[in-house]
Structure formats: structure tokens, C-alpha cells
Amino acid sequence: MKTIIVFLSLLVLATKFGDANEGVNQEQMKEVIQNEFREDFLNEMAPMSLLQQLEAIESTLLEKEADRNSRQKRCNGKNVPCGSNHSPCCSGLSCEETFGYGWLYKSPYCVIPSNG
């Protein structure tokens, strides 16, 4: 019976002092949670800012590529009919009436430009 009284008194004392320290513990827990939240927030923001930077770089590169028209449109090669009904000649070729094919098919052909 004496041991039960001793344990009950210890329980009451622990509860009383536990409540007194609980306010301090709650403040410490709030600080820890806030610090962890800040670290998590900063850790999440770092990849997001990196992602935003990469997207900005990618968009500028795509704009440059779109501005310079890096891909050539479909064109006709050498000795292929050209004109208003056909695709334009590729770079380095010109659409000219030729003696070889033009008189037979009655259309100009893509040929290497003459210097004369």
C-alpha cells in the first residue's frame, strides 16, 4: 500500500512539473517545426528556381531557333520542275528555262545558276 502511495505521489508531481515544462516544450516544438518548414520550403524553392531558369533558357533558345528559321522548307533538287505550280528550288539552285527538259515539259527546272 505504501508503494502505491509513493507511485501516486510521483505521478502527481510528474504531471504537475510536466505541465509546467509543457509550455516551454511547445515553444521549442514550434521553433523546430518552423525551422524545418523553412528548410523544406527553401529546399523546394531551390529546384523550382532552377527549373524556372532552365525553362527561361529553353524559351530563349527556341525563340532564336524560330527567328532564324533553322529548318529549310521543303524544296526541289537539281533537274526537278519548278515554277508557280511546284515547290521552290533549294538553296544554290535557280528556276530557269533549260534547253534539255524545258522544251519537252514546258516548265522551268531547278538548275545550278549559270554565270553568263
From Swiss-Prot:
GO terms for cellular component: extracellular region. InterPro entries: Toxin_22. Pfam families: Toxin_22. It comes from the Eukaryota. Residues 1-20 form the signal peptide. Keywords: Cleavage on pair of basic residues, Disulfide bond, Ion channel impairing toxin, Knottin, Secreted, Signal, Toxin. Expressed by the venom gland. It is found in: Secreted. Residues 21-76 form a propeptide. Disulfide bonds join C75-C90, C82-C95, C89-C110. GO terms for molecular function: sodium channel inhibitor activity; toxin activity. Ion channel inhibitor. The presence of a 'disulfide through disulfide knot' structurally defines this protein as a knottin. Belongs to the neurotoxin 14 (magi-1) family. 06 (ICK-Trit) subfamily. This is U16-barytoxin-Tl1c. It comes from Trittame loki.
